[in-house]
Amino acid sequence: MSKTVLKVTDLVRHYPLPKESLFGDQRYVYALNGVSFEIKEGSSFGIVGESGCGKSTLARNVMALEETDAGSVQILGNEVVGKSFAELRPLRQHFQMVFQDPYGSLDPHHTVGRIVAEPLTAVDDLGKSEREARVSEVLSSVGLKPTDAEKYPHEFSGGQRQRIAIARALITRPALIVADEPVSALDVSVQAQVLNLLRDLQDEFGVTYMFISHDLAVVEYLCDEMAVMYLGSVVEKGRTEDIYSNPAHPYTRILLDAVPNPASGKKRNRIRLEGGVTGQTERRQGCSFQDRCPMAQDKCRAEAPVLKTVGDDHIAACHFSDKVNELGAG
């Protein structure tokens, strides 16, 4: 049985908003509302949803880059929530991150070798020669030359810069890599190359991915399991192939309808999603998706649905999950 690399339990993150008056009530953006999931060793887990759904906030909290209001994040059984910088330092080698922007995430004043080696500061027992050897090894693994270590980021294309970022994430030989929209800033022609590289590296090193994306086609290609987020909550979770073939939440269904897939052979009327996600700033009764949902009924406005089992390792938070695939019929 595969061991659990990442376990997130009831994670909560609320951002306070500026008060409208001195004695006014404190308002919040409810970015994460009790998010829970696990990722097994050697697998890829996708987090999908529109901008503003909480994906990147989740990534920052998993990486302990900001304070968490409540909940637990365990990496290889080690709790990271509430840890000080000094306490996190020896744990950092086990989890690394690849950021969205290959231009902004690399210091232009540092050589590639220095950038890639930076995470090794968490590994105390490496000498200079071993660090240099590790840099050469990992640059070769991502399709770059060891001699590229002497160059600067501006000498590389966007796709090459993202390879440098991936090399930096791999340098400590982590168990987990959190990839936040790692190909969205790249040309379409380069995206496939980077995705193939990520798959090859997983086969070679056995690394586990938490992969964040708004592009469901990318998640389908790379991820074994996935969770769909809406306004800070997971509304559906399961094996990627199961969710694609049998979505159990109307939000998931609508997101999937937006993905061209001529090879699927399935014919169904496409449902369009009206409006956009602006962030949840107040608690409200009922389902958070009710204003945009084509299936909304009185029960949805009165009672918030909870995650329930809809199949093997497949859960969804919808009162009418068994009717989702009937959307647009007739």
Annotate each language-model stretch with its function.
Residues V178, P182, L186, V190-R268:
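P-loop NTP-binding/switch modules centered on Walker-like glycine-rich loops
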